[in-house]
């Protein structure tokens, strides 16, 4: 379950997704082996019922609620369900050895990520993002810092609990113990290099929980220092903090709109865009418009589940997450502190939007349930009854890995030609549509290529599909341009206004409106837009912004 972490993780179809599915399929084979070789099966627990209820709700949501291209999202849910069942069979067979293998695997994966990070900082390997020096195998430093924080918490907790006992044993045991200590030490400079406040907050919470019983006074002093540091960090990056606050408020508003069943799997982006438009519609001139954006992910895991799945998904997620954390902490599992770091990080970031972190989450929940439920001897025919379920699940997940590998290949081919606007590539885009129809950058590029070819209606159809999987108003702006060239002035005006309403911090839709009114001879409206552009305070000044303002000033002086 740690293997997907060390593979390349992207914001689009990635190798880590492929290997994540294959790891689950391999886990299913191990589960079948455990059923054959062992005489015991895990006892059922009420948490198994909660997990089953959640999986059924997700399946019904996908079939009856979601109008979005959510096959990939549901595929992940199915793979996670198979992984949970397989782990519930494997963990009792392995016994206490599994817990040791689990934290050792986390530390080993963390060691690889640390090595990659140091190589990037030293310039020996390329970072995965052009704006940041260190990203590990991830596409930006945010999720990378979260995983490093998870490993830091686990390694420090192990050394704090067991390090001294192991340091005096045989040579290889001492080597292992000091290797864990080295992993913990090297996590610190990497975390500093990522500049991730979320990771540091999560580590601080885990440290407070680890030290609370023995060093309560020190923890209280540390909490005071942390509050002061938090205030300083807020003013240091106030815009980013205000942006997270806005995303939380808007996501909460989106959830409230469909509180029971949610908007459907894969529907977070469109629901967020509509909620943000409604938010600013009643708060014209709000200072938060400057920090508004178009997030691809929910920066709060609970709200993300709530928006897509409603209460029927959010409640099981909270119950399983918090209950498993309590169980692991009560039983003294050192990996529990890594689970705590991941849960805290999910309140401010998007780890659960990525396959590697979902794999880790399922493993922690399955471990907690297995420790609580125990196992019992059963007759051979009961053990064999488990075979078809696990075998079919493993086969389905392996097929998912093949489909995902095809999507990865299609996206790589698309990325190689995306900068070339040529009619000759339209047929290639059309062939890749079924594999990439859930990815906004592909849909926008396809829509732009169709527009360049003069096929405005087809372009709008593709861009309209993009609005279902993205909350970026650029889709509406380009649709407005298509409507304008088709002579549909009212539709163009509506598209431009919607683009500005979704993101009032961008001036370009106002500029397009001004040019539309000017071309149609509606000079009063054009001058009104021009005055609005002149008074507009952009978040970032640029030559393009200054040019649009100059055109607006010229129009008002006519």
Regions found by a protein language model. Name each.
Residues 4-6, 22-34, 52-64, 72-89, ...:
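Alpha-helical transmembrane segments of multi-pass inner-membrane proteins
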Residues 1-63, 67-72, 78-108, 158-181, ...:
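Transmembrane signal-anchor hairpin modules in multi-pass inner-membrane enzymes, especially those
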Residues 435, 468-469, 502, 536:
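Structural marker of alpha-solenoid helical repeat scaffolds
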Residues 441-445, 474-478, 507-512, 542-547:
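Alpha-solenoid helical repeat scaffolds
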Residues 426-430, 463, 496, 530:
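Hydrophobic/aromatic packing residues within the alpha-helices of TPR/SEL1-like helical repeat arrays
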Residues 125-132, 265-308:
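Interfacial juxtamembrane loops and adjacent helix segments
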Residues 452, 485, 519-520, 554:
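Register position in tetratricopeptide repeats
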